[in-house]
């Protein structure tokens, strides 16, 4: 079966390396440095089978691309085409048109080209709701660990394999700080309602409004700051039409507060990889895509809602996600973490496919 994947981000590829295992993590009141929830990732390996990891996004993307294009392993390697922006989709004909007018056809089109993907219009028609400004924006920057270790004011704040999540008064801002590249680099994500042009001095200007002096000293080291507004969209009623399927931010764009945008994109790719294995007839595609939505749409939709606020997630938000959580009651932050991290997309996909194939064998045998 020939497949066109539009988009070569996390959703379009899948897997990772260059990671740091997180032994612990805390949620901290950034105004007074009081620890609100210690050991936020405590016992993750014993509970969910794997340790928590922090990874530089560039390293993750590099490894995903390597995995997708290498000749070793099952399946055919992907042929990655750059500078081939897709401007239109045809769900029924399973084809896309690039900005230079080239028309590409396949058995299946996977739209993984982000929150502004025009494929959403093809799937939903007049039902489509465009992603909009959430009022939130973020700044990101990296600082070499040596810059902190060589400064007496910050050396004591470097903690191996620790993620820290600092909150501001009233939820007005959040600062996420975690190590990557074997603790050689410190990665920062600063979230608030920023609207100013970002210069190296801007993070500190905002930090003076939001955080304690000790944290301002950390933010002062920001350089080469990247800035973007955060857009999102609520859950949508379906993710596929004919031979076109949405994954990643095209299907379920979400805010960053649960740190699940990339994780959910990888789950999408993992599920499709299993469900589309050994499909030899176009007539099988629709049933496999229905199974994909059965496994992924409620979960992706619930996490869109749960990602709308800083952790710990309030009960009102947990209740709002209940529509997409049949059989689950999220009564606490621990329940949210259990829901996020205990799900095994590989096992769920294999089990669902086995049931489908069993039914197909029974039908072919003439017993039904």
UniProtKB/Swiss-Prot annotation:
Cofactor: FAD
Signal peptide: none
InterPro entries membership: FAD-bd (IPR002938), FAD-dep_Monooxygenase_BioMet (IPR050493), FAD/NAD-bd_sf (IPR036188)
Binding site for FAD: 11, 249, 262
Entry annotated with the keyword Oxidoreductase: yes
Listed EC numbers: 1.-.-.-
Catalytic residues (positions): 140, 178
Gene3D superfamilies: FAD/NAD(P)-binding domain
Keywords, ordered alphabetically: FAD, Flavoprotein, Monooxygenase, Oxidoreductase, Virulence
Gene Ontology molecular function: FAD binding; monooxygenase activity
Family label: Belongs to the paxM FAD-dependent monooxygenase family.
Quaternary structure annotation from Swiss-Prot or TrEMBL: Monomer.
Function according to Swiss-Prot or TrEMBL: FAD-dependent monooxygenase; part of the gene cluster that mediates the biosynthesis of the phomopsins, a group of hexapeptide mycotoxins which infects lupins and causes lupinosis disease in livestock. The role of phomE within the phomopsins biosynthesis pathway has still to be determined. The pathway starts with the processing of the precursor phomA by several endopeptidases including kexin proteases as well as the cluster-specific S41 family peptidase phomP1 and the oligopeptidase phomG to produce 10 identical copies of the hexapeptide Tyr-Val-Ile-Pro-Ile-Asp.
Protein known as: FAD-dependent monooxygenase phomE
Species: Diaporthe leptostromiformis (Lupinosis disease fungus)
Lineage, broadest ranks: Eukaryota, Fungi, Dikarya, Ascomycota, Pezizomycotina
């Amino acid at each position: 079966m020939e497949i066109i994947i539009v988009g070569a981000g996390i959703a379009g590829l899948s897997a990772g390396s260059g990671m740091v295992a997180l032994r612990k993590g805390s949620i901290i009141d950034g105004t007074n440095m009081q620890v609100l929830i210690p050991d936020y990732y405590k016992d993750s390996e014993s509970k969910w089978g794997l340790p928590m990891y922090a990874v530089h996004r560039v390293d993750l993307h590099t490894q995903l691309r390597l995995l997708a294009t290498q000749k070793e392993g099952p399946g055919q390697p992907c042929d990655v085409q750059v500078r081939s922006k897709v401007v239109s989709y045809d769900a029924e004909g399973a084809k896309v048109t690039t900005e230079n007018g080239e028309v590409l056809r396949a058995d299946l089109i996977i739209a993984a080209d982000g929150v502004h993907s025009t494929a959403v219009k093809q799937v939903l028609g007049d039902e489509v709701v465009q992603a909009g400004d959430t009022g939130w924006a973020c700044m990101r920057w990296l600082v070499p660990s040596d810059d902190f270790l060589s400064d007496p004011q910050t050396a004591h704040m470097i903690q191996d394999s620790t993620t820290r999540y600092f909150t501001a008064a009233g939820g007005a801002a959040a600062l996420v700080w975690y190590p990557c590249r074997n603790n050689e680099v410190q990665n920062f994500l600063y979230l608030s309602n920023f609207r100013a042009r970002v210069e190296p001095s801007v993070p500190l200007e905002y930090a003076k409004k939001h955080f304690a002096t000790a944290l301002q000293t950390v933010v002062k080291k920001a350089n080469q700051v990247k800035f973007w507004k955060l857009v999102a969209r609520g859950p949508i009623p379906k993710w596929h039409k004919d031979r076109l399927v949405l994954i990643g931010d095209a299907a379920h764009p979400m805010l960053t507060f649960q740190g699940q945008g990339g994780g959910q994109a990888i789950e999408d790719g993992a599920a499709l990889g299993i469900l589309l294995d050994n499909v030899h007839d176009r007539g099988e595609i629709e049933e496999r895509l229905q199974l994909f939505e059965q496994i992924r749409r409620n979960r992706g939709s619930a996490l869109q809602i749960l990602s709308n606020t800083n952790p710990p997630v309030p009960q009102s938000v947990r209740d709002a996600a209940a529509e997409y959580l049949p059989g689950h009651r999220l009564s606490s932050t621990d329940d949210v973490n259990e829901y996020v991290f205990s799900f095994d997309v590989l096992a769920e996909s294999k089990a669902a496919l086995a049931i489908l194939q069993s039914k197909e064998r029974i039908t072919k045998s003439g017993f039904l």
